[in-house]
Amino acid sequence: PVIYGGTGNGPAFIERTADIHQAVQDIIASKTFDNGVVSAAEQSVVVDSCIAAEVRLEFEASGAYFMTEEEAERLGKLFYFKDGSANPELAGKAAEDLARWAKIDVPAGTKVLLAEQKYVSENNPYSKEKLCPVLSYFIEDDWMHACEKCIELLLSERHGHTLVIHSKDPDVIHQFAIKKPVGRMLVNTPAVYGSMGATTNLFPAMTLGSGSAGQGITSDNVSPMNLIYVRKVGYGVRRIEDLGMGTPADASGCRGAAADEDSLRKLQRLLEDALASINNQL
């Protein structure tokens, strides 16, 4: 079987209770690691509208450049060829080099380029994975709209990988955790470092599974446990004749004595039907 790491198109949401300075520093540190070639790196930033102005100022003070609509369009045309394939020449290139190719005049020392967007679409290069220090930037009215925007971004290109949220509100964090189609959700940490276990307690790994949602076999950080061969031995604990006599299996390993009686009756009926079908064929 193939252990599939998957395409990352992970957004980072900066919620109104976040430590804005730390959130921006985390995102820039993550997106500039290896100039953005790590799939787990942030691809988009989604910001709560009430703090958008402060977040923008923090980005600009930290070496980020917000492109004009025209500049973003020029750079966006370089990401993909006419046949839809990605341009490998842009992968891992520094922000200043990318700006030079797109004829964008940026301040010396620019670390990251940002393109403000409103919509997610299949033909928008800023809705996809960008293996370079370029981020799309969305402003949403509240965390609920931001939640939907993050889902849009995740579903736009093989979901299942990674999501980041910067917030101090446990209820918002919980809502994001239970709703997003991702293998890992990171809280108040850089995506690259957090996903590989450097700044979190996730298993240290460079191959990050995306699970069945991302067309893989695991959503774990791939470890030696995904690669070793484990033989399991199962001893017989009941006879076939017992299956039709109301003797349920010992479920102590998963549900224990609190197993639902109705579920057991349904299981018994299914087993009885299966045995009857087998006997009719003998």
Role assignments for model-derived ranges:
Residues 104-281:
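Conserved C-terminal structural/oligomerization subdomain of aldehyde/semialdehyde dehydrogenase
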Residues 1, 11-14, 23, 28, ...:
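Intrinsic structural disorder
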